[in-house]
Design a protein with these regions (language model features):
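Edge beta-strands of extracellular beta-sandwich domains
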Residues: 75-77, 113-122
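Envelope-exposed proteins and targeting segments
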Residues: 46, 101-103, 114
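A short, structured loop/turn motif at beta-sheet edges
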Residues: 57, 107-114
Length: 136
C-alpha cells in the first residue's frame, strides 16, 4: 500500500509530466501551422504542381526534391515573398503509385531549417498529411 504522502507526490509528478507533454506537442503544431505545402499531379499536362506558402514571411531559401522517379528532381533556389509554385514535367507515372514518390522540401526559415515531406496526389483527392521536422 502506498502512503498518502507518497501517493500525492506520485500524482503531482504524473500530472506535471502530462501537462508538459501536452504543451510541448501543441507548441510543435503551432510552429508549423504557418506552412502550406502540396504536390498535385496534373493529368492534362503530365506534370506535378508543387506549391509552398509561409504566412509568417520568414522563409528565404529552398531545396526541393521529388524522389522515387527514374531521375530524382532536385532544385535549390531563393524564395521571394516566402512562397513559390513549381511545375515539374514528368515522363511517366510511377509503376507502384504516388506513395513511392515522396516530395521533400528543406526551407531556411528565420534562423533555423524546417524539413517537410508529402506525397503527390491526384487533383480530385484530398492532400496527404505533411510531415514536419526542424533543425535549430
Amino acid at each position: 500500500m502506498i502512503a498518502p504522502r507518497n501517493f500525492l507526490v506520485i500524482l503531482i509528478a504524473t500530472i506535471s509530466v502530462g501537462v508538459v507533454i501536452l504543451l510541448n506537442s501543441n507548441y510543435e503544431n503551432e510552429y508549423f501551422d504557418n506552412f502550406t505545402f502540396d504536390a498535385v499531379y496534373l493529368k492534362d499536362s503530365n506534370s506535378i504542381l508543387i506549391t509552398f506558402d509561409d504566412t509568417n514571411q520568414k522563409s528565404s531559401f529552398a531545396i526541393l526534391e521529388i524522389l522515387g522517379m527514374e531521375k530524382t528532381f532536385h532544385e535549390e533556389f531563393v524564395i521571394s515573398d516566402s512562397k513559390f509554385t513549381k511545375l515539374v514535367p514528368i515522363d511517366n507515372i510511377p509503376k507502384y503509385g504516388w506513395k513511392t514518390t515522396p516530395v521533400t522540401l528543406e526551407i531556411t526559415y528565420d534562423e533555423s531549417v524546417v524539413y517537410m515531406k508529402t506525397e503527390i496526389h491526384e487533383e480530385d483527392q484530398i492532400s496527404p498529411t505533411v510531415i514536419f521536422g526542424k533543425n535549430d
